[in-house]
Design a protein with these regions (language model features):
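Glycine-rich anion/phosphate-binding loops
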Residues: 74-81, 99-108
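Conserved small/polar residues in nucleotide/adenosyl-binding loops
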Residues: 109-114
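N-terminal capping/small domains of soluble enzymes
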Residues: 1-94
Length: 120
């Protein structure tokens, strides 16, 4: 059975993808999930520069669940391109990078850097 889908020019072997921010950058869950079997790994947000995220507390229990406000903590695109993308490629994952930034220029820089590393 062919479950492949094409979304905005990205072909995935199936429609199952991870939620950005809940799956880190993939390596954190690779012990539990074969990343190559997913339709795609959607990474946590990554910016042009490292972001420390919000101060603690970042998580609060509420009736029926929890709330979190991590604040887009990330190592920045340079570390992401050097460390995370090669890991995901080696694992056979289709990669969707969630970019974040404080300006249009930041978003463009981060998107271009991610795009360049994915096309190598």
């Amino acid at each position: 059975m062919n479950l492949s889908v094409d979304i905005a020019g990205v072909t995935m072997k199936n429609p199952v993808t991870t939620g950005s921010g809940t799956f880190g950058s993939g390596e954190e869950f690779s012990e539990f999930v074969d990343l190559s079997k997913l339709g795609a790994v959607t990474t946590k947000g990554v910016a042009n520069v490292p972001w420390p995220g919000n101060p603690v507390p970042r998580v609060a229990e509420v009736y029926g669940g929890m709330l979190n406000a991590i604040g887009l903590q990330n190592p920045g695109i340079d570390v992401f391109v050097e460390r995370d993308i090669p890991y995901l490629k080696k694992a056979g994952a289709t990669i969707i990078v969630n970019v974040c930034g404080k300006s249009e220029n930041c978003l463009l820089y981060t998107s271009d850097a991610a795009d360049d590393s994915l096309r190598v």
